[in-house]
Amino acid sequence: MAGQRVLLLVGFLLPGVLLSEAAKILTISTVGGSHYLLMDRVSQILQDHGHNVTMLNHKRGPFMPDFKKEEKSYQVISWLAPEDHQREFKKSFDFFLEETLGGRGKFENLLNVLEYLALQCSHFLNRKDIMDSLKNENFDMVIVETFDYCPFLIAEKLGKPFVAILSTSFGSLEFGLPIPLSYVPVFRSLLTDHMDFWGRVKNFLMFFSFCRRQQHMQSTFDNTIKEHFTEGSRPVLSHLLLKAELWFINSDFAFDFARPLLPNTVYVGGLMEKPIKPVPQDLENFIAKFGDSGFVLVTLGSMVNTCQNPEIFKEMNNAFAHLPQGVIWKCQCSHWPKDVHLAANVKIVDWLPQSDLLAHPSIRLFVTHGGQNSIMEAIQHGVPMVGIPLFGDQPENMVRVEAKKFGVSIQLKKLKAETLALKMKQIMEDKRYKSAAVAASVILRSHPLSPTQRLVGWIDHVLQTGGATHLKPYVFQQPWHEQYLLDVFVFLLGLTLGTLWLCGKLLGMAVWWLRGARKVKET
């Protein structure tokens, strides 16, 4: 078995070794948070593999929290949108978060955020100095992150082949995958792959809503496209997505529901994994206080600060006070509220090494917002979860966590101290959740090739072959009536109706002839 794996690894990676020289690769990250972290990891992996990588990113913005920065071995090109745009964009995004966390989220608020992203994209495309510099670099490949449509337009403007990385759930973007609606849940449906009759009805109807939303979201970039692309060469975003040579998906079937894929679609869930380091001594000392009881890790992601919502903050703090475990809570509070007494078993920190803590032998539970990177890290280390999904793909992610039985979720609007404490105790006391999380970890780790090897191997394959046309089905070039066999259906329907009409005519003629023959016989 080990010999087979070595042969498979050599056969997959050898073409990359045979490349005559390192490729020049541009990675583009226009938003921050977990999206930036994933693109940073991709850039570093490819740089370590021997390619010359340059990352283009926006210095700061509403998506860009303060991260603990590390020295980069790849080149970074940063730019800034005008100050007035940044201020207005931040207001829009803060309003989006406030409304969403308050249970008043609307699709129009998301469209407003996308409109600011489109305007930010226009500001960048107007930067002739940067665009000329990128063109002069003559990159071999561009790698885009898909939360924002702008990287697709930049790649198109540069005229270079590009690879897309989807950092969130599958269904949040339509890029040509088959969607059998009987068992592949549509994004936002909150369904599993096991649907009853009414579930399939809901899924079928929501598919049309999903398609309409995609059109509305893409339309926010219409003005940007008209401004920066000449008539006759203006890309259609839905078509531009299909031009990607490869699609890397930040997921794994240890977490996601099984579904059909295309040859140019590659799972790389677990890409964020790094060698485990000892946790900082102050955290180790805190963990040691609770002995065999262990500790609970709490973080609600990089874009949301729980301390900004006092009610959520108080309910969570009260829930943690009921636990015998210690609680390490990532909560960026410059000042702890004077009217709230911090639970004795809780330690709050502005920053923490999440992966290292998830790998700690004393961890008992992970309380998470349900972000894709966080869930994949928890699965890697076999840690069960309680999810408090906030927005975006997070509710869909927690549906999968619950379906796979390595965690439960609580709706934000129903978050109460008693409910949260009960859920946490349920997960820690019922060993089936831990067993399911460990089983998922085994699935994730037992691939013949690691996520890094898959990423590097497939990119080297595309670089060597000059593209991935051989991996793309002809359906991408077919008109919609051919894709769905409507022309065949109309032909067969016409043939059937024509045959029935002809049979009816012949039958009528036969009846007329028989009647005529009878009258002749009677006379």
From Swiss-Prot:
<dbReference type="InterPro" id="IPR002213">
    <property type="entry name" value="UDP_glucos_trans"/>
</dbReference>
<dbReference type="GO" id="GO:0043541">
    <property type="term" value="C:UDP-N-acetylglucosamine transferase complex"/>
</dbReference>
<keyword id="KW-0325">Glycoprotein</keyword>
<feature type="topological domain" description="Cytoplasmic">
    <location>
        <begin position="505"/>
        <end position="523"/>
    </location>
</feature>
<feature type="transmembrane region" description="Helical">
    <location>
        <begin position="484"/>
        <end position="504"/>
    </location>
</feature>
<keyword id="KW-0472">Membrane</keyword>
<dbReference type="InterPro" id="IPR050271">
    <property type="entry name" value="UDP-glycosyltransferase"/>
</dbReference>
<feature type="glycosylation site" description="N-linked (GlcNAc...) asparagine">
    <location>
        <position position="52"/>
    </location>
</feature>
<dbReference type="Pfam" id="PF00201">
    <property type="entry name" value="UDPGT"/>
</dbReference>
<keyword id="KW-0812">Transmembrane</keyword>
<comment type="function">
    <text>UDP-glucuronosyltransferases catalyze phase II biotransformation reactions in which lipophilic substrates are conjugated with glucuronic acid to increase water solubility and enhance excretion. They are of major importance in the conjugation and subsequent elimination of potentially toxic xenobiotics and endogenous compounds.</text>
</comment>
<dbReference type="GO" id="GO:0071412">
    <property type="term" value="P:cellular response to genistein"/>
</dbReference>
<feature type="signal peptide">
    <location>
        <begin position="1"/>
        <end position="22"/>
    </location>
</feature>
<dbReference type="GO" id="GO:0008194">
    <property type="term" value="F:UDP-glycosyltransferase activity"/>
</dbReference>
<dbReference type="GO" id="GO:0015020">
    <property type="term" value="F:glucuronosyltransferase activity"/>
</dbReference>
<keyword id="KW-0808">Transferase</keyword>
<protein>
    <recommendedName>
        <fullName>UDP-glucuronosyltransferase 3A2</fullName>
        <ecNumber>2.4.1.17</ecNumber>
    </recommendedName>
</protein>
<comment type="similarity">
    <text>Belongs to the UDP-glycosyltransferase family.</text>
</comment>
<keyword id="KW-0328">Glycosyltransferase</keyword>
<keyword id="KW-1133">Transmembrane helix</keyword>
<dbReference type="InterPro" id="IPR035595">
    <property type="entry name" value="UDP_glycos_trans_CS"/>
</dbReference>
<feature type="topological domain" description="Extracellular">
    <location>
        <begin position="23"/>
        <end position="483"/>
    </location>
</feature>
<keyword id="KW-0732">Signal</keyword>
